[in-house]
Amino acid sequence: MPYEFKIGMYVNELRLPLDDALATAKELGADYPWFTNLDEGGHVGQMSDAEADKIAELYAKYDVKMMQLSAGSPFKFIDLVEVSAGSIGEHPTFKEEFSHLIRSMELAKRMGTDTVAAYTFAWPGEYTADKPTWPMRWATQGGIISEVEMGKLVQAFKLVVEQADRYDVNVSLAMMPWNYTNTTLHFRELADRVGSDRLKVMWGPADNYNCGEPDVATAGFSNVQPYVDSIHIKDLRVNDGAIIDFDYVPFGEGDVPWQDILHNLGEANSDVVLSLATHFEHPQGRVAAMQKNMDNLQQMIASL
């Protein structure tokens, strides 16, 4: 049988109530929408069973499946250098966000998914001191993670996968430029050292490229292939990487080698969801931006 791409959507970018967002996603052709927290529904990490059931009913109403459940952005803003090795579980912010992540694990299957989302800590000063390590990271194609810091990451995510085993769910890590899994090499080292099949990745080729990783289509794909369960679909143009000068553009109109990536996914028969996002501005608004990216994605798929 010919390879069929599964298409999802990060519906927070639509800035619509969830009911309308799911309807829009379905209309645009995305069968696997997902969200982080909801303005009308509160924090996933503090959600009641009844609230979760209402959301599951909305998904059933539109005949769509939740790609993953995200309790906000667990660990995204925690500066790793401020976390003490050996006592990660006692760090106040980690402790709070870990509890939210565990609650998402408790709710995941109730809401129709077996995957929850997590992030991988901030590089030093990333959100507090204007990204002081960025020039070094760009020059080294993603940065250098010390053994001490990698050890902390491994400790943290071994705690996470212990809970994932308990609740029989997978944990998909994001690949943000501002976090430690900003490249496929960094993710692969962390995943291999944690050593759990529970750990997955929402691969972000655009973010990898934006961090200076040179070959996201082939070497990058090879690095993430054993772990990838979804792909963050957006495009960008890097103007001057050393000073973080880049522009988000419609899918297929930037620097990211998406044609090669989609081809490789099909050749490998990868069981992944293409999670459509935008990030660029459209004169007719957010839904129009998502429609533009969906149209471009479908055209590229048809051309393979």
PLM features per residue range, with description:
Residues M1-G8, R15-G29, D53-A60, E106, ...:
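Histidine-acidic metal/acid-base catalytic patches
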Residues A52-A71, K152-A164, R193-V194, W258-I261:
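Alpha-helix-loop-beta-strand connector modules within alpha/beta enzyme cores
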Residues Y10, L28-D49, S70-V81:
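N-terminal substrate-binding region of glycoside hydrolase catalytic domains
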Residues P17-D20, I78-K200:
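Active-site acidic/histidine proton-transfer and metal-coordination neighborhood
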Residues D31-Y32, K65, D114, N170, ...:
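Residue-level detector of anion-binding/catalytic polar loops
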Residues W34, Q68, A117, D229-H232, ...:
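Conserved beta-strand positions in the central sheet of alpha/beta enzyme cores
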Residues Y10-L14, T36-L38, A71-P74, F121-W123, ...:
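Active-site beta-loop-alpha junctions enriched in small/polar residues
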Residues T36-A56, T120-Y127:
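Glycine-rich, proline-tolerant flexible connector loops at the mouths of alpha/beta enzymes
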